[in-house]
């Protein structure tokens, strides 16, 4: 995975990194989120990489970018997006059956650029439909054909028949006959096959679902047996792939953690035993709280945007959102940052910070989750997540102090990704 991702490290898609050295004068520098913020600093970038970081305003080498009135920090990382879609509910289900694969790839690029301009220079895409759009977009960025954030992609998500990833849920027999089922599995042997298929298609990470989902309308209970989860996770790990697990109910989360999951996505319901298993496994918790914004906004526009069964689950999700984070963070569970963008809006990824702070995380730790912690989760800690010599020049800037008011991260003044200026 890392070799493919680093192949495009010196370029930002079609525009490429700036050829000459670039000097950035930063008024305040959050070089390593979670550590002390530095005062006036100078960052030198060359060939897409950070060459040096020094105190004070040093003479410019090549082009000068003046950010002396800004807070400068590493490019943000969203560990849970669906880059090829910006719809959900009835509209999203219709799109699955009416939009072509090439159109979904164009949509991925459209959403990717909104995400990049919002300061998120890396994303982890946790599930396409059957389009493979995120894989194609990832590779096009790496080849320099188009612009976009660095993408770590799961390809298609895996679940059991009738589980969260079964697109046939609620459809008639004629639709069922033409629906993809190769990402569904039943029994350990079949689940090993499903992982191997996604790896063969180029997945960087494996995403599985141990419970139903809010949008799938089949309930939020556990939808996978112990031997199936074990087969999925062990097979993925044998290929060197981390495993992200969609789970809402506590039993599905415990099932995943017992079997070595690397991250839990959503984790909406959590008890003390769940927290203990998180810490024992060393897994990262990705709360995706800002999905609530997406649900509320769609329902405000159309009260019938979701089928009744889904609407019931949305009401439950809204009522309990943030409770697990309030339990997990003080207990020492490692928190990572993800939005589930596609359910919520691409380009508004920073809304998640406000939710995290609302539910008990200091702004500094929420920012660390979206940089240092996520870089570790993605296996890219040597490349991204901090502003240090040798790393990819993924750098953003905001007016004001995001430690005092994390909402400052909703308005990005400057974006550099892999040494190329996207927004200034």
PLM-predicted stretches and their roles:
Residues 1-18:
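Gram-negative bacterial Sec-dependent N-terminal signal peptides
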Residues 29, 33-73, 95:
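Histidine-rich, glycine-flanked metal-binding segment
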Residues 71-139, 143-145, 161-164, 227, ...:
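Metal-associated gating/positioning segment near the N- to mid-region
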Residues 83-104, 161-180, 215-225, 282-318:
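Active-site gating loops and adjacent loop-to-helix segments of metal-dependent hydrolytic enzymes
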Residues 87-90, 134, 163-164, 217, ...:
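Histidine/acidic-residue-rich catalytic or RNA/ligand-binding cores of hydrolases
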Residues 96, 238-242, 306-309, 315-402:
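His/Asp/Glu-enriched, well-ordered alpha-helical/loop segment
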Residues 107-134, 147-157, 203-214, 242, ...:
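Divalent metal-dependent hydrolysis catalytic cores, especially in the metallo-beta-lactamase
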Residues 136, 190-285, 301, 316-334:
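Histidine/acidic residue-rich metal-binding segments in metalloenzymes
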């Amino acid at each position: 995975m890392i070799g493919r991702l680093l192949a495009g490290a010196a370029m930002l898609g079609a525009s490429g990194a700036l050829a000459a050295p670039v000097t950035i004068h930063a008024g305040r520098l959050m070089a390593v989120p979670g550590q002390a913020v530095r005062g006036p600093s100078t960052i030198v970038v060359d060939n897409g990489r950070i060459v040096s970081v020094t105190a004070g305003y040093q003479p410019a080498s090549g082009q000068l970018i003046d950010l002396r009135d800004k807070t400068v920090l590493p490019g943000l990382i969203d560990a849970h997006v669906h880059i090829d879609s910006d719809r959900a509910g009835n509209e999203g289900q219709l799109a699955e059956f009416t939009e072509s694969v090439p159109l979904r790839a164009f949509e991925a690029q459209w959403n990717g650029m909104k995400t990049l301009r919002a300061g998120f220079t890396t994303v982890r895409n946790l599930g396409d439909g059957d389009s493979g759009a995120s894989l194609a977009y990832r590779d096009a960025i790496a080849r320099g054909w188009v612009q976009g954030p660095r993408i770590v992609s799961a390809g298609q998500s895996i679940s059991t028949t009738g589980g969260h990833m079964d697109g046939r849920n609620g459809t008639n027999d004629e639709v069922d006959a033409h629906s993809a089922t190769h990402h569904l599995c039943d029994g350990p042997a079949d689940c090993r096959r499903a992982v191997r298929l996604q790896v063969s298609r180029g997945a960087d990470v494996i995403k599985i679902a141990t419970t139903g989902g809010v949008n799938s309308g089949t309930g939020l209970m556990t939808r996978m047996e112990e031997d199936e989860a074990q087969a999925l996770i062990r097979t993925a790990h044998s290929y060197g792939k981390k495993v992200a697990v969609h789970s809402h109910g506590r039993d599905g989360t415990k099932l995943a953690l017992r079997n070595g999951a690397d991250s839990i996505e959503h984790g909406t319901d959590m008890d003390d035993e769940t927290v203990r298993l998180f810490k024992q496994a060393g897994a990262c918790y990705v709360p995706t709280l800002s999905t609530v914004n997406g649900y509320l906004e769609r329902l405000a526009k159309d009260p019938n945007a979701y089928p009744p069964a889904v609407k019931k689950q949305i009401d439950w999700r809204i009522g309990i959102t943030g409770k697990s984070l309030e339990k997990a963070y003080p207990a020492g569970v490692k928190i990572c940052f993800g939005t589930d963008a596609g359910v919520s809006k691409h380009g508004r990824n920073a809304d998640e910070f406000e939710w995290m702070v609302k539910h008990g995380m200091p702004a500094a730790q929420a920012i660390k989750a979206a940089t240092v912690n996520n870089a570790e989760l993605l296996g890219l800690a040597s490349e991204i997540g901090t502003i240090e010599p040798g790393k990819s020049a993924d750098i953003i800037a905001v007016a004001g102090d995001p430690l005092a008011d994390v909402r400052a991260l909703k308005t990005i003044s400057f974006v550099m990704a892999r040494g190329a200026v996207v927004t200034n």
